[in-house]
Amino acid sequence: MSAEILRVHPDEPQPDRIDYIVSCLRKGDIVALPTDTFYGLAVDPVNLYAVEGIYRLKTRQKHKPLSLLISSVAQAYELARDTDSLLDKLADRFWPGPLTIIVRAGTKLPLRSTANTGNVALRVPDAAIPRAVVERFGLPITATAANLQGASECTHAACVRDQIGDRIPLIIDGGPTGRSLPTTIVDLSLGEGRWEILREGAIPTHEIVMVLQR
């Protein structure tokens, strides 16, 4: 069975369509939707059946946690523990935007949702559709790239349809995404004010360093 394609306005998402997306997430469905980098696969991160579905679809190694999209810095503090001023510095400068920040996970997320690492990767996207979904859902959503392992990331809905349209129930067509580079990833879970840039992406390394060394 082919996925349903649902067109949603990229800048002013229709509330009834956001409600429909949320209802699918609450059922445990996998939903492909646009972010500000690539199309991602969204599920309810506390629904372990749905989380396992993404790992099966992507043939993703079980020790690799899924990143989560959130709607605000306040939500990051609800999901994290043992945070420090580095999170504020990065969030103030780069959120919403293509920066993923790894922090120690709090108790609101099942350990399996962190791939048993105890850490969680968070991001506030600069894209209206996923932020509207998170706000309406009341929980973060997963955001792993909507592509098969080894295939190119998707910047438009047709690419998602061609790669995995027969394996997921719903694809949100919000037009092309704004960037063709992945997020930059910074690990703040090390504690004691330590940090590490794990991947340089849309935000150059030197910009991250400038902010963190202030």
Segments predicted by a language model, with ranges:
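Active-site-adjacent structural elements in enzyme catalytic cores
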Residues: M1-R214
